Amino acid sequence: MDMEKARLRSHMLIESLPYLQKFQGKVIVIKYGGHAMKDTLLKQSFAQSIALLNLVGIHPIVVHGGGPQIGNMLSRLNIQSEFREGLRVTDKATMDVVEMVLAGSVNKEIVNQVNQAGAKAVGLSGKDGAFILAEKNDLILTKENQPPEIINLGNVGRVVHIETSLLYTLIEKGFIPIIAPVGTDNKQTYNINADEVAGAIAGALKATRLLLLTDVEGILDLNKKLIQSIYLEDTPKLFSDGIVFGGMIPKLQCCIEAIEQGVEKVVILDGRLEHSILLELFTDQGVGTEIVKKPV
């Protein structure tokens, strides 16, 4: 390493110092999904970032998705999968595959990668200790001058309650929870949107940060420029102006709910960027779009 590179790295370490102190002992919830879960280099850098947070005294909690992996397994098993309004209709056969993939292969791969990076990760689904209590979530479509249409999505659920004691026990012992977004009502098993689970966990724990990894830079304005920061109170305009649409709508709704439940800051950031988590947390500029409450 030449002297200039060494000097640059030393400056980066010094820049991170106040943030390391600020986040010491704090809970940070990360939603892990998209391209960051597919690319080999990004998977490795994600695991290293999570391990680093843990090793410097921060408490990361990871909630992961797995839609493409579920789709691949359903195809291999010749199980047809139906989508309504972007949501997977989850019958009994599909739910068995969803649970097998999310709580099994995907979850354990992430656990193994974080462990290899030098930390201690533990894989969970919401059925462990019934810590994610859920209920059935049917889709209600409303059309002008017509009665609402209720669409049965099968075992698609929504979060009712997060039992935090299991998570606190793990992080206090230095473990990193890696969570598959599967919930239960103690009778049925439910497939839940991973963004919703991450937001609910962050809110229940009053996390310092909720970070959502996506396949875009963050929220873009109508000129396709990154919105670096927005107040919670100004988010309705993002919907009314058509700035957020499609899959970004439920993502932003989860962000809003998390802040309303006590999360200090939510950031939507680009998971395609290597070590984007560290760049967001430990640099002056940060990356992505941050959402915070207006100061009183």
Swiss-Prot record:
Main subcellular location of this protein, as a coarse class: cytoplasm
GO cellular component: cytoplasm
SUPFAM superfamilies given in the database record: Carbamate kinase-like (SSF53633)
EC nos: 2.7.2.8
Binding-site list for substrate: 66-67, 88, 191
Catalytic activity entry: N-acetyl-L-glutamate + ATP = N-acetyl-L-glutamyl 5-phosphate + ADP
Name of the protein in question: Acetylglutamate kinase
InterPro entries associated with the record: AceGlu_kinase-like_sf, AcgluKinase_fam, ArgB, Asp/Glu/Uridylate_kinase, Glu/AcGlu_kinase, NAGK-C
Keywords for this protein: Amino-acid biosynthesis, Arginine biosynthesis, ATP-binding, Cytoplasm, Kinase, Nucleotide-binding, Transferase
Metabolic or biological pathway: Amino-acid biosynthesis; L-arginine biosynthesis; N(2)-acetyl-L-ornithine from L-glutamate: step 2/4
GO MF terms, alphabetically ordered: acetylglutamate kinase activity; ATP binding
Compartment(s) where it occurs, according to its Swiss-Prot or TrEMBL record: Cytoplasm
Example of a GO biological process term: arginine biosynthetic process via ornithine
Family stated for the protein in its record: Belongs to the acetylglutamate kinase family. ArgB subfamily.
CDD domains documented for this protein: AAK_NAGK-C (cd04250)
EC category name: transferase
Domain of life per record: Bacteria
Site (Transition state stabilizer): 31, 251
Job description of the protein: Catalyzes the ATP-dependent phosphorylation of N-acetyl-L-glutamate.
